[in-house]
């Protein structure tokens, strides 16, 4: 019996798990108030019942491990990789075995489960994606490339975002649901918010980073000067993990945009040899209604992490841009934590193309249309030289005309070579279609949110 027939067999035995309904119990309500039946956002309380009904749940661990390993190796790409996800949906035993067999994208370079969207990309390669823009609906959809052709629109849906213009800022709601893109949906995983000029952005994540305590303390400090009230909506965890700054073009000179990203959830040591990204999520668990109502009741009496993004004053941005690790951690014993700085990404230095008479970047065939939105980000050096800011390389941007990559201007060590590696590149290939390639230490969610900043209107950067 082939492994594919085994997968089909246990699928027929179980049926579709999504058709089951589960009841949500909300504490603090009387018996006449019953929770509504919801799908994937509820807890699977009847997992033992499913396991008893399955004839595959009692497989010996050695046999189950062999089946999972062979299936994971055979179905390495989408759409056939959905069989691996189906195996993880069988029961707790199969789910735990899949988690043990399927490695993170950092080591296998594959996106398998939804949590992979918030885990770092591969160290030894890139994950190629593309973004489709719908101007009429103000939506953006991220897909995983299933082909090497840049104009091939066949892809695996990953994330979606919807733009909402406010009086003083712009919001981009990011969701795993392609249709219901809102903060109330079960697929909501974060958002992007810009200031009025479109020069400063903050990326918010629903998953707490490793330094969530420090980020929350900074948010509470900045909110003391804000008089705006808490929105009476069901709150959702919101942690400011990234700040993106675009340099103002006061003189109005023609050229590409200059940007800098402060990754507050990623330490600068992550790109060094042997470095890691701490606090990687192992699963995406939606918040229960019980927790939401409890935190909504307490948010009116004290500052909460669920309402960070009401103030967009300059002092607030300076707090995030200056010190990412200040505050309560200074009271702790570990001095190493205080010395850890956030990873900073900047534009890669381009080279001058004599024939085109412009500054160019080598996108290796992944970008074909010249656009001010195109960019490549690399890790900023710990101690940048004084002349680096004066180079036109900070404004690096161009089409894909050249064939040779730019060479380093001076001899570099292994550490400097790590800082020359392109971590994220984004560029235009057709009307309303853009490519996005990312790698370690960024996740798909972080890379997508950074690319969304390039779509926003910038009144003082062009």
UniProtKB/Swiss-Prot annotation:
Annotated CDD domains: F-box_AtTLP-like
Tissue expression as described in the entry: Ubiquitous.
Annotated spans, Disordered: 317-338, 383-418
Domain of life assignment: Eukaryota
Pfam families: F-box-like, Tub
Domain F-box: 54-109
Residue stretches of biased makeup (Low complexity): 383-417
PROSITE patterns associated with the record: TUB_1 (PS01200), TUB_2 (PS01201)
Membership in a protein family: Belongs to the TUB family.
Protein name as annotated: Tubby-like F-box protein 7
Organism: Oryza sativa subsp. japonica (Rice)
Lineage: Eukaryota, Viridiplantae, Streptophyta, Embryophyta, Tracheophyta
């Amino acid at each position: 019996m082939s492994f594919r027939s085994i997968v089909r067999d246990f699928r027929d035995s179980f049926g579709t798990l999504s058709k089951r309904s589960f009841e949500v119990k909300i504490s603090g309500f009387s018996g006449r108030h019953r929770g509504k039946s919801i799908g994937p956002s509820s807890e699977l309380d009847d997992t033992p019942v499913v396991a008893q009904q399955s004839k595959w749940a009692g497989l010996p661990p050695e046999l189950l491990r062999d089946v999972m390993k062979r299936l994971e190796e055979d179905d390495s790409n989408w759409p056939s990789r959905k069989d691996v996800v189906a195996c993880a949906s069988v029961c707790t035993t199969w789910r735990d075995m899949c988690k043990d067999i399927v490695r993170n994208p950092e080591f296998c370079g594959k996106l398998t489960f939804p949590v992979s969207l918030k885990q770092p990309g591969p160290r030894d390669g890139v994950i190629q994606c593309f973004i489709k823009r719908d101007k009429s609906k103000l939506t953006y959809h991220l897909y995983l490339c299933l082909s090497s052709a840049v104009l091939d629109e066949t892809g695996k849906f990953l994330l979606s975002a919807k733009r909402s213009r406010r009086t003083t800022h712009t919001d981009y709601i990011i969701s795993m649901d392609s249709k219901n893109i809102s903060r109330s949906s079960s697929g909501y995983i974060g958002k992007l918010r810009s200031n009025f000029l479109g020069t400063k952005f903050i990326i918010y994540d629903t998953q707490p980073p490793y330094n969530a305590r420090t980020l929350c303390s900074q948010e509470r400090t900045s909110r003391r000067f804000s008089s705006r009230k808490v929105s009476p909506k069901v709150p959702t965890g919101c942690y400011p993990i990234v700040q993106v700054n675009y340099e103002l073009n006061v003189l109005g000179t023609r050229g590409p945009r200059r940007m800098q990203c402060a990754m507050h959830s990623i330490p600068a040591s992550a790109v060094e040899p042997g470095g890691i990204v701490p606090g990687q999520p192992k699963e995406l668990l939606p918040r229960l209604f019980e927790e939401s109502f409890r935190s909504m009741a307490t948010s009116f009496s004290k500052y909460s992490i669920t309402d960070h993004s009401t103030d967009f004053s300059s002092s607030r941005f300076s707090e995030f841009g200056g010190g990412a690790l200040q505050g309560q951690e200074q009271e702790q014993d570990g001095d190493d934590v205080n010395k850890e700085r956030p990873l900073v990404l900047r534009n890669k230095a381009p080279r001058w193309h004599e024939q085109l008479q412009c500054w160019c970047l080598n996108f290796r065939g992944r970008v074909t249309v010249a656009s001010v939105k195109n960019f490549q980000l690399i890790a900023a050096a710990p101690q940048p030289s004084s002349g680096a800011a004066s180079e036109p390389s900070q404004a690096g941007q161009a089409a894909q005309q050249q064939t040779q990559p730019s060479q380093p201007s001076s001899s570099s060590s292994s550490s400097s070579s790590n800082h020359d590696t392109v971590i994220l590149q984004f560029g235009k290939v057709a009307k309303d279609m853009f490519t996005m390639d990312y790698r370690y230490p960024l996740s798909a969610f972080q890379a997508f949110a950074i690319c969304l900043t390039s779509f926003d209107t910038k009144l003082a950067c062009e």
